[in-house]
């Protein structure tokens, strides 16, 4: 079985992290976002993953080719010369996707959840129509594509992209199974699968919804990235508690790479992820943060709701909070306060940032 993952976007919502690394390769809980998806697909029996690539495609290709042998699957690249939306990439990869008559997965690359891929396959085969969409319930459906479907069968009657008035609280979770017949509906041009393809399929009775059980998050922007981390760590607590870290000063759900080092008298957690090579000196307090590979947090600093990029250096007695995001290789000097700062890569910060703003 095959899967197509849409990884061609610029990742603008997750800047400044995506200025130096394509979004699918940004580490989420110590593993690239894309790898969470690919490993789950491989575990469900997918043997060929196609990546619809554009921005920083060489970095993506290099990283995923290295994973091919480890996972025992085939990984192909489908290169977009121009942005093709969310349906155009299917037409571009038509030859690969239609090599067999089997249905195939399509995934948005921003999504993290428990990935019920085997259950999706069973659901799709049971109803026998052209398309299956994974849906989830949210409190603010107006930001998403909303699905109106039959409660017992899942047959979708309407598919409304970002409705202005309340239609339903079930939204498109960004994961589909489609039969090859769907490819005949899509032309090789910029096309939205949500606005142009799914509404027609729903009208013809060819689209069904399966409701996701468990957590779900679109982690495409920093505040949602941190919320997704909290949900993921709680899921680990329930299913794989042995993967979480415990020890002096550890509070709640904390994930620590074995190569990270934590000093004395620290308070780490709840909801913290420390990546490979991270150094946390004595007396540091970190809550609800992701600290990426080779970052260094010096003594007595206090971080809450932050993303610290690769190889950053945070000085002594620094306070950072309110979804402060440091791009790659940022230096924050001693005794500064950063409130909601978004700092571009390779910057050195010499004065406090008391109000949320972008540091260029």
From Swiss-Prot:
**Where is the region Substrate-binding domain?**
2-222
User: Which amino acids does the record list as binding GDP-alpha-D-mannose?
Assistant: 110, 218
**GO CC field:** cytoplasm; cytosol; GDP-mannose pyrophosphorylase complex; mitochondrion
Molecular-function annotations in GO = GTP binding; mannose-1-phosphate guanylyltransferase (GTP) activity; metal ion binding
Q: Name one Pfam family in it.
A: GMPPB_C
Which cofactors are reported in the record for this sequence? Answer: Mg(2+)
Q: Just give the chief location class.
A: cytoplasm
Instruction: Tell me how the cofactor is bound.
Output: Coordinates binding with substrate and required for enzymatic activity.
Q: Where is this region: Hexapeptide repeat domain?
A: 245-360
**Mechanisms controlling activity:** Enzyme activity is reduced by incorporation into the GMPPA-GMPPB mannose-1-phosphate guanylyltransferase complex. Allosterically inhibited, when part of the GMPPA-GMPPB complex, by GDP-alpha-D-mannose binding to GMPPA.
List the CDD domains hit by this protein, alphabetically. Answer: M1P_guanylylT_B_like_N (cd06425)
State the reactions this protein catalyses: alpha-D-mannose 1-phosphate + GTP + H(+) = GDP-alpha-D-mannose + diphosphate
Query: Which InterPro entries would you find in this protein's record?
Result: GMPPB_C, GMPPB_N, Hexapep_transf_CS, Mannose-1P_guanyltransferase, NTP_transferase_dom, Nucleotide-diphossugar_trans
Residues at which Mg(2+) binds: 110
Keywords per UniProt: Cytoplasm, GTP-binding, Magnesium, Metal-binding, Nucleotide-binding, Nucleotidyltransferase, Transferase
Question: GO terms for biological process?
Answer: GDP-mannose biosynthetic process; GDP-mannose biosynthetic process from mannose
Catalytic machinery residues: 162
Q: What does this protein do?
A: Catalytic subunit of the GMPPA-GMPPB mannose-1-phosphate guanylyltransferase complex. Catalyzes the formation of GDP-mannose, an essential precursor of glycan moieties of glycoproteins and glycolipids. Can catalyze the reverse reaction in vitro. Together with GMPPA regulates GDP-alpha-D-mannose levels.
What is the similarity comment for this entry?
Belongs to the transferase hexapeptide repeat family.
Task: Supply the domain comment.
Answer: The N-terminal substrate-binding domain adopts a Rossman-like fold and has a binding pocket for GTP or GDP-alpha-D-mannose. Substrate binding is coordinated by an Mg(2+) ion. The C-terminal domain consists of a series of tandem hexapeptide repeats that adopt a beta-helix conformation. The beta-helix forms several protein interaction surfaces involved in assembly of the GMPPA-GMPPB mannose-1-phosphate guanylyltransferase complex.
Q: What is this protein called?
A: Mannose-1-phosphate guanylyltransferase catalytic subunit beta
The organism of origin for this protein:
Mus musculus
């Amino acid at each position: 079985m095959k899967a197509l993952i849409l990884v061609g976007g610029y990742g603008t919502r997750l800047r400044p992290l995506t200025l130096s690394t394509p979004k699918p390769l940004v580490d989420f809980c110590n593993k690239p976002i894309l790898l969470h998806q690919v490993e789950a697909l491989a575990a469900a029996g997918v043997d060929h993953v196609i990546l619809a690539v554009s921005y920083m495609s060489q970095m993506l290709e290099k990283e995923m080719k290295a994973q091919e042998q480890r996972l025992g699957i085939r990984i192909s690249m489908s290169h977009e010369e121009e942005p093709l939306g969310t349906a155009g990439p299917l037409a571009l990869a038509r030859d690969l996707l239609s090599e067999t008559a089997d249905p195939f997965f399509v995934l948005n690359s921003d999504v993290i959840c428990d990935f019920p891929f085997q259950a999706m396959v069973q659901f799709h085969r049971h109803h026998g129509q052209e398309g299956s969409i994974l849906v989830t319930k949210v409190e603010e459906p107006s930001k998403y594509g909303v699905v109106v479907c039959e409660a017992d069968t899942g047959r979708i009657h309407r598919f409304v992209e970002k409705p202005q008035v309340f239609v339903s609280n079930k939204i498109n979770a960004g994961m589909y199974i489609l039969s090859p017949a769907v490819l005949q509906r899509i032309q090789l041009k910029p096309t939205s699968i949500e606005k142009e393809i799914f509404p027609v399929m729903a009208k013809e009775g060819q689209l069904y919804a399966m409701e996701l059980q468990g957590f779900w998050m679109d982690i495409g922007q920093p505040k949602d990235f941190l919320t997704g981390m909290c949900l993921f760590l709680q899921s680990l607590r329930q299913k794989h508690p042995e993967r979480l870290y415990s020890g002096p000063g550890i509070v709640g759900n904390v994930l620590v790479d074995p190569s990270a080092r934590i000093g004395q008298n620290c308070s780490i957690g709840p909801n913290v992820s420390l990546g490979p090579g991270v150094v946390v000196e004595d007396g540091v307090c970190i809550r609800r943060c992701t600290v990426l590979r080779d970052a260094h947090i010096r003594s007595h600093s206090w971080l809450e709701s932050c993303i610290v990029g690769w190889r950053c250096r945070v000085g002594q007695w620094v306070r950072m909070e309110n979804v402060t995001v440091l791009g790659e290789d940022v230096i924050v000097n001693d005794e500064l306060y950063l409130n909601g700062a978004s700092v571009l890569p390779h910057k050195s910060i010499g004065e406090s940032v008391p109000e949320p703003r972008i540091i260029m």
